[in-house]
Amino acid sequence: MNLLTTSCQAVAHAAGQFNVYWRNGLQGAGLMSVSVHRSLPDPEVIAELSALQWLLCQRAVFGATQNGKGLSLKVSAGAIRKAVRAITAGDAEQFGKPHLKPYAHFLATRFAGAELEVDKDRSWIPERLPSDHATLSIRQPLPNTVEISGVGVVAVSKHAFERFGKWLCMQAGHDTWRLLRRMM
């Protein structure tokens, strides 16, 4: 099972700036400096969700073909798990924080079926800054993308993903993403 652990901490005296520490499995820690636009509500949750998406999709820490099957995520914000559950159940508006829905959408589609656990333990965070460091600036949700040979990187909308799943009569979201990627 692939394990990705993240922990988000606000940077002191810097509004909208967050350090998202991450580790792949039990070894190797990294750091993402995430800047969230000041107009966005719940910036710490958005920072952690955006870092997760960047690590899983753009950086592909578990490979480009990884989907939710065999993936375990430990996050520090309970709102992430609640948002994914609300999206999966189809009642994101009842969740109370519908503005998080576009940021958590990738976990309910491409990474559907991933085990999601809230863990506040920060003892694994190194005292020194990790050598693996990246920067991310967020004004809007990152797109869900797939690479199509001969075309390049293409964003997959929620509507396209859902229609493709219905067309295939698929039950599991991770199978839908895998087959969509294979067809592309």
What does each of the following model-derived ranges do?
Residues R59-I125:
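RNase H catalytic domain
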Residues E115-S149:
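Juxtamembrane and targeting peptides
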Residues V34-Q66:
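Acidic helix/loop or adjacent segment enriched in Glu/Asp that either coordinates divalent metal
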Residues M1-E44:
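RNase H-like nuclease fold core
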Residues R139-T176:
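Arg/Lys-rich, positively charged N-terminal/basic patches that mediate binding to nucleic acids
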Residues S35, S39, D91, I148:
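Conserved short-loop catalytic and cofactor-binding motifs
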Residues S50, D175-M184:
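A charged amphipathic helix-loop-strand protein-protein interaction module that recurs
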Residues Q17-Y21, S33-S35, S72-K74, E115-E117, ...:
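Ser/Thr- (and often Asn-) enriched beta-sheet segments in non-cytosolic proteins
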